[in-house]
């Protein structure tokens, strides 16, 4: 480890960027963050209007251990930084087409009563079995995926990966796994809609992701008082105390490459200024980075063709009065459940009857709205942008019974349709007409997500988390050619979501430190594992282990590819 401070430029002040920057500053690096917008947080930011506050993106704090851990690693705590986490109870109200609802809760007594009302006395026992399985998915994923890097196919041959591969059901969908425990269509829907957190259909999302249902049901849904951005704000403050420099309203035109050394040597700003650095980390959308900030390559083209998550039309409504029928988190499920997901993820369209999420931050935190009023966020999932040969986009179902528009994507009409559908659905199911209560409306469309945050195709959660888009198959945290160029954020390993990006910041920061010559006991937050006794495969020689891992890694890759391309396709 050199005594000379290495300089680091981080592109993008999203969660992954500010987390990685703070960690590297803690280790003594000189870090500068460049952000194109005039605010930090990326999608994890706030929108304000006349006393109303809205979370622009994430509004549910899950996997709290990663939030506590990063502040502990930085020598502080959420409490010390003024972040107060509020528990949302109930978790959700889930509304169905017949006007009935289901209340999700961490309270086992309430869940027992609600589940037995639908599936009888045996239903609760099966629910406990579902919790047991999802708990296993949770613990294995946290320790073997969210805390580990997967730089190559060889990584798939790790003993803990091989041992747990079929225990976490990556080759079955969440819907398939839930159907083994819940016998009614209603409860299957209740316990699978959460795959939307990954931007995926429950009929395609690997069963492993039931870990999200576990963290909600066991740990609860939390919300930072003052908005989700309070967490980002605290990380920014810690970073600044450690020496991180933030330069907002500073766009990056390209990552500069020294052809003589084959390394990144800084960035070129939008105004043409060159900023040098020893290390570059891009927390910008990964597909955007490869296609807009780096020299064009066939790999960049292939990334553009990868499966991505969905987009959304998001409404931010300032309501003139409190709407008591709505809790902090509300889900309205389409009657044609599978068909609505197929419209989004297979046809990349907007469903004629979408499922949608309604967040009322003022219900859990009254400071989100003026007294006597509510702030309401409605997120309607839609297909990501698809450009056709004429440069237009299509996005609304054109099936004969869909009520859709015969259009190459008239977004004004599509937004109007989404708004009308949401208002009509809520009027029918909860008996409240929101239309006359809306004093002000702000809208984010797929184009907003694309233009404001450089999200490829307006996909709000980056690349998909399908089986061939995770672990060693997901774009790596280090560029294959420019070894001092690294990546953070939703589309690299381990994946999307605020806690996952925070977990990823630890992975990439430790990778950078080790590449810079740090030993385990020199990493500020790491325990010294150099004296740990070796056993099992660790006793093998390096060359033997590499060959063994290579064989197993290749075998796993072949089996997964075969399943995905042959069996799943049929």
Curated annotation (Swiss-Prot):
It catalyses: 15-cis-phytoene + A = all-trans-phytofluene + AH2; all-trans-phytofluene + A = all-trans-zeta-carotene + AH2; all-trans-zeta-carotene + A = all-trans-neurosporene + AH2; all-trans-neurosporene + A = all-trans-lycopene + AH2. This is Phytoene desaturase. It is an enzyme of class 1 (oxidoreductase). Its EC number is 1.3.99.-. One of its GO terms (molecular function) is phytoene dehydrogenase activity. Coiled coil: none annotated. Pathway: Carotenoid biosynthesis. Disruption phenotype: Leads to the lack of coloured carotenoids and the accumulation of phytoene. The lineage of its organism: Eukaryota, Fungi, Dikarya, Ascomycota, Pezizomycotina. Disulfide bonds: none annotated. Belongs to the carotenoid/retinoid oxidoreductase family. The chain crosses the membrane at residues 547-567. It is found in: Membrane. Its cofactor is NAD(+). Keywords: Carotenoid biosynthesis, Membrane, Oxidoreductase, Transmembrane, Transmembrane helix. Induction: The expression is subject to photoinduction. Expression is slightly induced after 2 hours of incubation at 42 degrees Celsius. GO terms for cellular component: membrane. Phytoene desaturase; part of the car gene cluster that mediates the biosynthesis of neurosporaxanthin, a carboxylic apocarotenoid acting as an essential protective pigments and leading to orange pigmentation. Converts phytoene into lycopene via the intermediates phytofluene, zeta-carotene and neurosporene; and further desaturates gamma-carotene into torulene. Neurosporaxanthin is synthesized from geranyl-geranyl pyrophosphate (GGPP) through several enzymatic activities. The gene is carB. It is a single-pass membrane protein. PROSITE patterns: PHYTOENE_DH.
